[in-house]
Amino acid sequence: MDSDFYRAYLLHRRPYSDSQVMLDMLVEGVGQLRMLARISGRQATKHKAQLQPFQALLVHYNGKYDLKYINKFELHGTPLFLKGDELYCGFYLNELTNRIVPINEPIDQVFQLYNTHLKNLNSGANLQAVLRSYEFQLLELLGYGVDFSFDASGEPIDEKRTYSYFAEVGFLVQDDPRSGFSGLQLNAIANHDFSQADVLYMAKQLSRYLLKPLLGNKPLKSRELFAASQ
């Protein structure tokens, strides 16, 4: 393998011109990059077939500015075949990553995090648990992680108490145990242990709250597709 080739996954693609496509790629050791690839000539059909989601690629690119240019690319390993709910979850991973990971900022650990969780979708694991694990770890990498060890007053999270979460404040103890997060649930979320249904449910509520400022008002298409399929 050429030393200038990088492992990458396609997150999003769209037409750019009659002979070029614009690609948002997650590149190992680099982060998310926006690239142009020429798709024309006798190899056009082959190249279009290779530029698919969930297929690991080796890409060779150049360009000093925001937009990079792919010189060569080739398949790397066998494609990951997702179907049913696995496929919708894969689309969600791609769209979420594409939307909240900054382009052209060096966040080198995102590729490995994505690669691991993408493969976990195809492993028979609880799909919702895989998504929650990815969301919380991705938020941590991007600097939006939550401190699950201490509440807003600096006291350790107590498994027997109930908490509410407030952005830029943290967890505050509340008196009503019928709502909010139990300390036991928070400790489980911190350890990415989503084996209990109540923990998985509360983790989803918290992750959506944390992701909303990053996603803005534009809905995720993958969520809409999944909802329509049910």
UniProtKB/Swiss-Prot annotation:
Q: Which GO terms describe its biological process?
A: DNA recombination; double-strand break repair
Q: Which InterPro entries match?
A: ARFGAP/RecO, DNA_rep/recomb_RecO_N, NA-bd_OB-fold, RecO, RecO_C
Task: Report the Pfam families cross-referenced here.
Answer: RecO_C, RecO_N
Q: Name one GO cellular component term.
A: bacterial nucleoid
What keywords would UniProt list here? DNA damage, DNA recombination, DNA repair
Family per UniProt? Answer: Belongs to the RecO family.
Function comment: Involved in DNA repair and RecF pathway recombination.
Extract the PANTHER family matched here. Answer: DNA REPAIR PROTEIN RECO
Q: What is this protein called?
A: DNA repair protein RecO
Q: Which organism is it from?
A: Pseudoalteromonas translucida (strain TAC 125)
